[in-house]
């Protein structure tokens, strides 16, 4: 009986490890970190074979299958949490101010961000549009700064596929 619980726990933990590595490896691949992704795939496959063999060798126990399935789901969550922490890549943050007369671009520049700004027309009049490129790990901090300066600002971010040119392009990993 103790051996059965040990196998269920092992399947659960090993599958969490497998799917966590799988999720991070997939994100590394999408971000262009091919060598790191390839290296992580080696560990991913070793762990996968171990987990799958434990389930297939003990297929008569439904708890093993459930441990595998639940470990898979938990592994996805853990992998996504890890990816959020390491926050690879860059984002483009677009801001539409509530009022045009704000000195938001200079205040954001003073914080070390590159800002391009221009006049925009909204439903209720003139607005200022800003475009800011920053590392993903700085996204929450940037949002906080913008909201402190203009709590009514409309903010949306997206992930650029390629970056070329600009005053800090040499800092951006190609």
From Swiss-Prot:
Q: What is its main location?
A: membrane
* InterPro entries documented for this protein: DUF2179, DUF5698, UPF0316
Organism superkingdom: Bacteria
Q: How does it sit in the membrane?
A: Multi-pass membrane protein
Instruction: One Pfam family, please name it.
Output: DUF2179
Stored HAMAP family: UPF0316 (MF_01515)
In Swiss-Prot or TrEMBL terms, this protein is called: UPF0316 protein LMHCC_0787
Source species of the chain: Listeria monocytogenes serotype 4a (strain HCC23)
């Amino acid at each position: 009986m103790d051996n059965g619980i040990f196998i269920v726990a092992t399947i659960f933990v090993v599958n969490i490890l497998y799917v966590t590595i799988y999720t991070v490896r997939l994100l590394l691949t999408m971000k262009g970190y091919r060598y790191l992704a390839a290296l992580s795939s080696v560990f991913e496959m070793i762990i996968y074979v171990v987990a799958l063999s434990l389930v297939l060798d003990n297929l008569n126990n439904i708890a093993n299958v459930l441990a595998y399935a639940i470990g898979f789901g938990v592994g996805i969550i853990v992998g996504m949490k890890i990816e959020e922490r390491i926050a690879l890549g860059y984002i483009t943050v677009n801001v539409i101010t509530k009022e045009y007369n704000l000195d938001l671009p200079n205040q954001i520049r003073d914080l070390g961000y590159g800002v391009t700004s221009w006049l925009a027309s909204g439903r209720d009049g003139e607005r200022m549009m800003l475009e800011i490129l920053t590392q993903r790990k700085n996204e929450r901090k940037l949002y906080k700064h913008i909201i402190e300066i203009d709590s009514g600002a409309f903010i949306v971010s997206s992930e650029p596929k390629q970056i070329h040119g600009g005053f800090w392009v040499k800092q951006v990993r190609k």
